[in-house]
């Protein structure tokens, strides 16, 4: 692989050594080959930035965070991602809850994140978009 591996997930690994599962596997891979992990900042802000922020260097790879407003968190994360997509992706249509602004909030966050990733991605980078938060 000529370029960097860029992992995009809803959350960043919060520990220096994540415990088990896919997060651990990706963390160890990035520690060996380098790259970037992009995920949401753990705290909301009234004015989300149009740029990614460095969240801490993990040795050979960098963690970058994107910010969410309380409204983004409500509509993108709690709303469309967790109340619509999660139930649909897990064959639990009976749990789907629709709300005003869910789809619009989801689309806005994904569009903003796409613009942010374009600022750091290089043509030869491999981008791994993980999970339904970023369909």
List each model region and its residues.
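N-terminal low-complexity, Ser/Thr- and acidic-residue-enriched intrinsically disordered segments
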Residues: 1-72
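Structural motif
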Residues: 4-6, 125-128
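Conserved nucleotide-sugar donor-binding subdomain of glycosyltransferases
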Residues: 72-126
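Short His-centered aromatic/hydrophobic patch
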Residues: 131-133
């Amino acid at each position: 692989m000529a370029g960097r591996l860029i992992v995009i997930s809803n959350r960043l690994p919060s520990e220096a050594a994540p415990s088990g599962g896919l997060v651990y596997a990706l963390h160890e891979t990035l520690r060996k080959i380098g790259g970037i992990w992009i995920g949401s900042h753990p705290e909301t802000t009234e004015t989300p930035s149009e740029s990614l922020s460095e969240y801490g260097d993990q040795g050979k790879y960098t963690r970058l965070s994107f910010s969410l407003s309380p409204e983004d968190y409500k509509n993108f994360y709690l709303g469309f991602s967790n109340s619509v997509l999660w139930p649909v992706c897990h064959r639990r249509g009976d749990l789907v809850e629709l709300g005003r602004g869910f789809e619009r909030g989801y689309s806005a966050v994904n569009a903003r994140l796409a613009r942010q990733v374009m600022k750091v991605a290089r043509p030869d980078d491999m981008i791994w978009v993980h999970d339904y938060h970023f369909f």
